[in-house]
Design a protein with these regions (language model features):
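Soluble catalytic regions of large protease machineries
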Residues: 13, 21-207
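Single conserved hydrophobic/aromatic residue that forms the stacking wall/gate
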Residues: 1-7, 12
């Protein structure tokens, strides 16, 4: 279905945003999709926007784990469709990237929100600059290297869980991923309702 399009920036972008959208759609504990678009805006080549159904003043562990999976939806979609060797830099790291957001979120869950059974309900540090939390903790607090390594391990565990959840969804629902990606090529922007209709009813927007 994608023969001849591998390496096309547009095709990768459609698949990437389609991956975010499909993982999000399959996470009942996460916010509903408002829209998905491949129209560039600022530094973003495309985006999937989610809006909560009501005002929230906090988030559950289940919600944040769903967010981790959604963060990896784009990268995993590229991997599933094009193969690991064709994953783009758009799915990589850097400030504001999917990997950066996932790492920062997992870090906060472990060190700020007390959501790690291993580390317990303790706040371990404020420094958000280092990718490897153990190092930043060592810089801001006199914790042992053993504790720093445990923190890194817990962060990695959460990140891996999100990545694997995204991969499970996109592998099992690969046909839906193709549908959304192809629709994004055609229409460029899809609402949450249109995405639901494409997945559940094979019904596409009218031109």
């Amino acid at each position: 279905i994608w023969k001849g399009l591998v390496g096309s920036e547009m095709c990768i972008r459609d698949s990437h945003e389609g991956g975010h959208a499909l993982v999000s759609f399959n996470m009942p504990s996460y916010d509903p999709i408002h829209k998905a678009t491949i129209i560039p805006r600022g530094r973003a080549l495309g985006m999937v926007m989610n809006l909560p159904e009501r005002d929230k003043h906090g988030h559950s562990i289940k919600y944040l784990k769903a967010r981790l999976a959604v963060c990896f939806g784009g990268r995993v979609a590229e991997e599933v469709i094009f193969g690991k060797d064709n994953i783009s830099t758009g799915a990589g790291g850097g400030s504001g990237s999917d990997i950066n957001q996932a790492t920062q979120l997992a870090r906060a869950m472990v060190t700020k929100y007390g959501m790690s059974e291993e580390m317990g309900p303790v706040e371990y540090g404020e420094n958000q600059e280092e990718v490897f939390l153990g190092r930043s903790v060592t810089q801001t607090q006199s914790v042992s290297e053993e504790v720093a390594q445990k923190i890194d391990k817990e962060i990695r565990k959460l990140v891996d869980e999100g990545y694997n959840q995204a991969k499970k969804i996109l592998t099992e629902k690969i046909d839906d991923l193709h549908k959304i990606a192809k629709a994004l090529i055609t229409y460029e922007t899809l609402t949450g309702e249109e995405i639901e209709n494409i997945i559940n009813k094979n019904l596409y927007p009218k031109d």
